[in-house]
Design a protein with these regions (language model features):
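Conserved Lys-Pro-Asp/Glu-containing loop-to-beta segment of HAD-superfamily phosphomonoesterases
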Residues: 80-112
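Acidic, Mg2+-coordinating phosphoryl-transfer loop and its flanking beta/alpha structural elements
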Residues: 99-139
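Short, acidic loop-to-helix structural element flanking the phosphoryl-transfer center
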Residues: 13-44, 50-57, 81
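Conserved H-loop
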Residues: 63-67, 94, 139
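Short beta->alpha linker loops
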Residues: 23-27, 48, 75, 103, ...
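Short amphipathic alpha-helix with an adjacent loop that forms part of the alpha/beta core around
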Residues: 145-151
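A short, structured active-site edge motif that brings together acidic residues
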Residues: 63-78
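Phosphate- and divalent-cation-binding pockets in alpha/beta enzyme and binding domains
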Residues: 27, 52-55, 110, 130, ...
Length: 151
C-alpha cells in the first residue's frame, strides 16, 4: 500500500511532465504587460512546489513580469495560507492595494487570510456556482479581471 506522501509525489511528477503540453490563458503575456505598464506589480502564490513553479514560469518566459514567485516546499499544499500571510507582511504597500486573483475556493480562503480583495476566475476546476458562494467578484477570464482592474 502506498502512503499519501508517495501518491502525492507520484501525482505531482506526472503533473510536472505535462507542463510542456499546457497553454497560457489567451492574452496572458499581453495582460501582464498592460497591467505592469499601468503600475501594477505581480506576485505568483502557488501550491506548486517552489522549484517546479520557477521552472514552469521560466518555461513560459514569464519571470520578468513577477516581483516574487512563492511556491511550497512540499506537495501537500499545507502552507499556501501561511506563505500568503508572510508575503503580505513583506510587501512594501498596504494590503488595501492588493487583489488576489485565483480560480479555486482555496484561493478565496488564502485571500481572506491575507486580508486582501479577491477575484475568482471560472477557468479552474470549480464551477461558477461554487465560486459565487464566496461572495466575491467571479469572472470568466483573466482579460475580464484585467479590464476590471484597469477601469
Amino acid at each position: 500500500t502506498e502512503t499519501f506522501e508517495e501518491v502525492a509525489h507520484e501525482y505531482m511528477e506526472g503533473y510536472i511532465q505535462q507542463v510542456p503540453n499546457c497553454r497560457l490563458q489567451e492574452g496572458a503575456v499581453e495582460i501582464l504587460r498592460t497591467l505592469s505598464e499601468a503600475g501594477y506589480s505581480h506576485s505568483l502564490l502557488s501550491a506548486y512546489h517552489q522549484q517546479r513553479l520557477e521552472e514552469a514560469v521560466d518555461y513560459f518566459g514569464l519571470r520578468k513580469w513577477f516581483i516574487r514567485l512563492i511556491g511550497l516546499n512540499d506537495y501537500y499544499a499545507h502552507s499556501k495560507v501561511e506563505n500568503g500571510i508572510k508575503w503580505i507582511r513583506e510587501l512594501p504597500f498596504p494590503r488595501q492595494e492588493v487583489v488576489f486573483v485565483g480560480d479555486m475556493l482555496h484561493d478565496y480562503e488564502v485571500a481572506r487570510a491575507m486580508g486582501v480583495d479577491c477575484i475568482l476566475l471560472t477557468c479552474g476546476h470549480q464551477s461558477r456556482n461554487q465560486l459565487e458562494r464566496c461572495g466575491v467578484l467571479v469572472l470568466d477570464s483573466l482579460s475580464e479581471a484585467a479590464d476590471r482592474l484597469l477601469n
